[in-house]
Amino acid sequence: MASVSISCPSCSATDGVVRNGKSTAGHQRYLCSHCRKTWQLQFTYTASQPGTHQKIIDMAMNGVGCRATARIMGVGLNTILRHLKNSGRSR
């Protein structure tokens, strides 16, 4: 059986990563025993994927409208507005 090495997105550790149940959609969740962060590799909703926030900010800075951004990315208008509203705060 082949094993796949999964690294923690927070601390980049590979040796302390263990499976940690499943999400409500049935996707495998993982837990890093070093930093105690949990994550999953697959997402059901597009807005939950890593990098979505930065894509929304980049599109806004390039002059793409909110409704067009929502349509292109496949997320709701309120999601776009929430990301833009929270972009001024430090993440």
UniProtKB/Swiss-Prot annotation:
Domain of life: Bacteria
Family matches, as InterPro entries: InsA_HTH_dom, InsA_N_dom_Znf, IS1_transposase_InsA
GO biological process: DNA transposition
Coiled-coil spans in chain: none
Entry keyword annotation includes Ion transport: no
This protein's record includes keyword NAD: no
Keywords: DNA recombination, Transposable element, Transposition
Chain's role: Absolutely required for transposition of IS1.
PANTHER family linked to this entry: INSERTION ELEMENT IS1 1 PROTEIN INSA-RELATED
Entry similarity comment: Belongs to the IS1 elements InsA family.
Protein name: Insertion element IS1 5 protein InsA
Gene: insA5
